[in-house]
Amino acid sequence: EPIDLLGKVFVFSKESNVDDVKLLTPQTE
C-alpha cells in the first residue's frame, strides 16, 4: 500500500515542511 503512504505524506507536507516529504519520498521528485 505505497500509494496510501504517499497520499498521507503528501497531505502532511502541506501542514509540515515540503523538505520532510522530499526526504520521506524522494521518488516523487
Curated annotation (Swiss-Prot):
Per the annotation, how and in what number is the cofactor bound? Binds 2 calcium ions per subunit.
InterPro entries assigned: Pentraxin-related
| GO cellular component labels | extracellular region
Q: Where in the cell is it found?
A: Secreted
Q: What is its main location?
A: secreted
Q: Which cofactor does it need?
A: Ca(2+)
A GO term for molecular function: carbohydrate binding
Keywords, sorted A to Z:
Amyloid, Calcium, Lectin, Metal-binding, Secreted
Q: Where is the Pentraxin (PTX) domain?
A: 6-29
This protein's assembly is summarised as: Homopentamer. Pentraxin (or pentaxin) have a discoid arrangement of 5 non-covalently bound subunits.
Family to which the UniProt record says this protein belongs: Belongs to the pentraxin family.
Could you tell me what this protein is called?
Serum amyloid P-component
Which species expresses this protein natively? Hippoglossus hippoglossus
| Lineage summary | Eukaryota, Metazoa, Chordata, Craniata, Vertebrata
